[in-house]
Amino acid sequence: MFGADKGTADRLDGRKLHIGIVQARFNEGITEALAAACREELLALGVQEKNIRHVRVPGALEVPLALQALAEQDEYDALIALGCIIRGETYHFELVANESGAGVTRVSLDTQTPIANAILTTENLEQAVARQTEKGRDAARVAVEMANLLEELS
């Protein structure tokens, strides 16, 4: 598997940031690994443990509502959505993937809060396992970078 060229990131100083994480429990083995990698990377970027709020919801469709509730508290510089949707035999995969993704984007735009979307959508469990650690780290980096960018732009 080849990785995407993500370019060189800057604005990765998380020392002053408050970050909220919303994790879906469905496919919990994968989402726990995403969360662990995400938290580890946030700490490595300087975000203080006390400035990380981590909440869990039943599944990917519930993630946007929890993100909105956190964003409306106006305490977080950025939020992170974690989940895992694995294709099954029915149309449900497309519905959950599309609606959760649209919901995350809507919350971000409506609240002007950066949200790193790491809700994995994979064909099978093996693909999810292959992505769980790096996508968790990526989400942390995206959240920190976008929080700092929005601060610069304001």
UniProtKB/Swiss-Prot annotation:
Pathway recorded for this protein: Cofactor biosynthesis; riboflavin biosynthesis; riboflavin from 2-hydroxy-3-oxobutyl phosphate and 5-amino-6-(D-ribitylamino)uracil: step 1/2
Enzyme superclass (EC): transferase
Residues that, per the record, bind (2S)-2-hydroxy-3-oxobutyl phosphate: E89, T90, R131
CC terms in the record's Gene Ontology section: cytosol; riboflavin synthase complex
Keyword Transferase tagged: yes
Organism lineage string: Bacteria, Pseudomonadati, Pseudomonadota, Betaproteobacteria, Burkholderiales
Family statement: Belongs to the DMRL synthase family.
Protein name, per record: 6,7-dimethyl-8-ribityllumazine synthase
Binding positions for 5-amino-6-(D-ribitylamino)uracil per the UniProt entry: F26, A60, L61, E62, C84, I85, I86, N117
Cited SUPFAM superfamilies: Lumazine synthase
Pfam families: DMRL_synthase
GO molecular function: 6,7-dimethyl-8-ribityllumazine synthase activity
PANTHER family: 6,7-DIMETHYL-8-RIBITYLLUMAZINE SYNTHASE (PTHR21058:SF0), 6,7-DIMETHYL-8-RIBITYLLUMAZINE SYNTHASE DMRL SYNTHASE LUMAZINE SYNTHASE (PTHR21058)
